[in-house]
Design a protein with these regions (language model features):
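A domain-level signal for the structural core that forms small-molecule/cofactor-binding pockets
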Residues: 1-138
Length: 138
C-alpha cells in the first residue's frame, strides 16, 4: 500500500523525512488494528519527494506544503473513526517533526482507493477479499 510523502524543501529538517515516513506508516497500521501484521507490513511501500519551494503551491502561489497520500484497497480507511484519527495523527506527526514551524493549515492528507481486483503484488492481481484473507491469516 503505497504512501507518497511530498514535502517542500525545508518543511522538515534534513533526515526527518525518513522518520516521518516510518511514523506515518506505523500510524496507518495502528489505526487499522494491523500493527505488526506479517502480511501487510511488508507491503507498506512508498516514496518521499522533497521539492524546491518554487515547485510547490497553495492558493496558486508558491508555498511550503506537505502532502500525505495513500493508495489503498477500498476496505482501508473505510471507518470514519479511522479517517478522522489517522488524519489528525498524520498532521500532528508532520507538524511536530517540523519543530512546530510548518502550519497545520498547509498539511494535506488524502486517500485514494484502488479498484477491487486491481491490487497488484508480485505480478498477481488480488481482490479485496484475497487481501483481507491474507491479512487475517498472518
Amino acid at each position: 500500500m503505497p504512501l507518497t510523502l511530498t514535502l517542500t524543501e525545508g518543511v522538515l529538517p534534513k533526515g526527518q523525512e525518513k522518520v516521518a515516513f516510518s511514523r506515518l506508516s506505523d500510524a496507518m497500521l495502528k489505526w487499522h488494528g494491523l500493527a505488526g501484521n506479517k502480511a501487510l507490513t511488508p507491503n507498506i511501500v512508498g516514496s518521499i519527494h522533497v521539492l524546491p519551494k518554487e515547485h510547490t503551491y497553495s492558493g496558486a502561489k508558491e508555498a511550503s506544503v506537505a502532502f500525505v497520500e495513500w493508495k489503498v484497497p477500498s476496505f482501508a480507511f473505510a471507518s470514519r473513526d479511522v479517517q478522522v484519527g489517522y488524519i489528525e495523527e498524520a498532521t500532528s506527526i508532520i507538524h511536530e517533526l517540523s519543530g512546530a514551524h510548518h502550519p497545520k493549515e498547509r498539511i494535506w492528507v488524502n486517500v485514494v482507493h484502488a479498484v477491487d481486483g486491481a491490487w497488484g503484488i508480485a505480478g498477481m492481481a488480488f481482490t479485496n477479499a484475497q487481501l483481507g484473507e491474507g491479512a487475517a491469516s498472518a
